[in-house]
């Protein structure tokens, strides 16, 4: 998925591994072969100098914050989430894993429901139902991620998760699956028993939509070209639309 390639060249005695994050694999292949010869250099016997990273680590972990007094009211309660019919019709029901493979599986994930939080000092757990699966992740609330095994769309993942109260009535959760290219971010805002869940992801859905828009001809016939551009332009707002719920 997303242009992950492993190429072995016996003639050049090299192994080339690449994860591009590009949806259109042919574009990645063209790029590889366009620059492939420049990647091969003669070995002069000298050790390869250490290369300093040019990019910093992604800010995956939420910083530690003060806990909210609302924890006592939320503890152990079940949050029932509404189903978004537009997302279901489009084939993108809201999932805790924003990666295409969970939507392409025959055992499709999506339609997160029955969310339960339990708090314990520097950690909390978040439990939810999705499809036929029931998962619980352990989230660090002290700025350090915790790991948890989860299963979605019939596939096993290890999730790195953190959580923090953004304000007295809003909790945010970050979850990144090991081996995945995306991190799911959700903010749950509470107004009495009413819950508003605002999803986002890293990489953003907008980046995926922009990449798809560049290849709109692959998805729509010429007569619908303009319609396709409009559809992809609106995709982030549809997929990341707020979802309402209620504390039972």
Residue ranges and their predicted role:
Residues 1-137, 144-156, 177-241, 246-248:
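Catalytic loop of the DD-peptidase/beta-lactamase superfamily, centered on the K-T-G motif
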Residues 167-169:
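Residue-level recognition of beta-strand termini and adjacent short loop/turns
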Residues 163-165:
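Structural signature of eukaryotic scaffold interfaces centered on beta-propeller domains
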Residues 173-175:
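A conserved acidic, glycine/proline-rich C-terminal tail/linker
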């Amino acid at each position: 998925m997303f242009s992950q390639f492993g190429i072995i060249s016996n003639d050049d005695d090299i192994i080339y591994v690449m994860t591009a994050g590009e949806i259109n694999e042919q574009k990645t292949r063209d790029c590889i072969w366009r620059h492939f010869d420049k990647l091969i250099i003669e070995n002069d016997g000298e050790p390869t100098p250490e290369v300093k990273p040019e990019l910093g680590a992604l800010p995956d972990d939420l910083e530690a914050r003060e806990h909210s007094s609302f924890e006592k009211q939320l503890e152990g309660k079940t949050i029932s989430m509404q189903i978004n019919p537009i997302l279901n019709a489009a084939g993108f029901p809201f999932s805790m894993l924003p990666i295409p493979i969970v939507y392409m599986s025959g055992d499709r994930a999506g339609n997160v429901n029955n969310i339960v939080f339990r708090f314990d000092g520097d950690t909390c757990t978040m439990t939810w139902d999705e499809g036929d699966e029931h998962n619980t992740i352990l989230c660090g609330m002290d700025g350090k991620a915790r790991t948890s095994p989860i299963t979605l769309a019939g596939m096993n993942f290890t999730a790195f998760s953190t959580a923090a109260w953004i304000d007295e009535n809003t909790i945010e959760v970050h979850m990144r699956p090991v081996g995945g290219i995306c991190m799911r971010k959700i903010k749950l805002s509470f107004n009495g028993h009413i819950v508003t869940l605002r999803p986002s992801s890293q990489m953003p859905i907008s980046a995926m939509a922009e990449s798809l828009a560049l290849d709109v001809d692959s998805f729509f016939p010429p007569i619908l070209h303009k319609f396709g551009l409009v559809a992809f332009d609106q995709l982030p707002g549809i997929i990341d639309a707020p979802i309402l719920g209620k504390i039972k």
